[in-house]
């Protein structure tokens, strides 16, 4: 895994249209976390982390504030998480996470992305067992041993710490996300976390043949165009 884990999500072009989609995805997720918990980030750690992540991705403050205000207002949409799994073009393994207020619509939208690219949507558990659901932190560094020792001293249940090409990657159970982040920030105040998220890390990767690469990119683009799709994880070697 290490640096090559790349949190295999669909990349988004830096166009105005793509930015609007990013803002919409963050706005929806912030709204859900604020509505289902406290709208005060200091009282809701997942919300606090998501807001920090949104700011890092240059989501405007008014988008964040609007989502929180909407949650405080009560009513509104009732979004539920939905996850779909299957095999993408080239035999790749794919997990699609959504937030939806209409499960039937979302399923049909996601299914069409699979069907129109010759992919095959499966049932729950079809490919998720091929991924590790983990907290991942990545930052520049050269001494992975001191990182491991520090986290162990703080009683963090670390899964693995890897060093590759001057980049350190820390893997931990999802339940240890905030404990790991707090320990890293406390021990290394000047540390810049380039990646800090809970994600699906593929246990193995699948090379994409040249004849499948265009179809696979079309598949990702179609999923990106689905309003309800929040994240796409895959094991393709692009």
Curated annotation (Swiss-Prot):
Q: Which UniProt keywords apply?
A: Cytoplasm, DNA-binding, Transcription, Transcription regulation
- Indicate what this protein is called per its UniProt record: Probable transcriptional regulatory protein VS_II1504
What the entry lists under Pfam families is as follows: TACO1_YebC_N (PF20772), Transcrip_reg (PF01709)
- Report the superkingdom from the record: Bacteria
Q: Principal localization?
A: cytoplasm
Q: Name one GO cellular component term.
A: cytosol
**Any GO molecular function:** DNA binding
Query: GO annotations under biological process?
Result: regulation of DNA-templated transcription
The cross-references to NCBIfam families, in alphabetical order and at most eight, read: PRK12378.1
Q: PANTHER family annotated for this entry?
A: TRANSLATIONAL ACTIVATOR OF CYTOCHROME C OXIDASE 1
Q: Which residues form the signal peptide?
A: none
In which family does this protein belong, per the annotation?
Answer: Belongs to the TACO1 family.
Record localization: Cytoplasm
């Amino acid at each position: 895994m290490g640096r090559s884990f790349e949190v295999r999500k669909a990349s988004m072009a830096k166009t105005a249209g793509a930015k609007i989609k990013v803002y919409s995805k963050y706005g929806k997720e912030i709204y859900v976390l604020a509505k289902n918990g406290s709208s005060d980030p200091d009282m809701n750690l997942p919300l606090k982390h998501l807001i920090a992540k949104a700011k890092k991705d240059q989501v405007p403050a008014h988008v964040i504030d609007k989502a929180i205000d909407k949650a405080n207002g009560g009513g509104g949409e009732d979004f539920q998480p939905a996850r779909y799994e299957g095999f993408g073009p080239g035999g790749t393994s794919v997990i699609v996470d959504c937030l939806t207020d209409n499960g039937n619509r979302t399923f049909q939208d996601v299914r069409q992305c699979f069907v129109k690219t010759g992919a095959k949507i499966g049932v729950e558990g079809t490919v998720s067992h091929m991924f590790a659901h983990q907290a991942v932190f990545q930052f520049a560094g050269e001494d992975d041993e001191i990182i491991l020792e520090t986290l162990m001293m703080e009683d963090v249940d670390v899964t693995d710490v890897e060093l590759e090409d001057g980049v350190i990657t820390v893997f931990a159970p999802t339940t240890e996300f905030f404990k790991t982040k707090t320990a890293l920030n406390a021990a290394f105040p000047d540390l810049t976390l380039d990646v800090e998220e809970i994600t699906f890390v593929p246990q193995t990767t699948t090379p994409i043949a040249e004849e499948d690469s265009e179809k696979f990119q079309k598949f990702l683009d179609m999923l990106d165009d689905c309003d309800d799709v929040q994240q796409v994880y895959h094991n393709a070697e692009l």
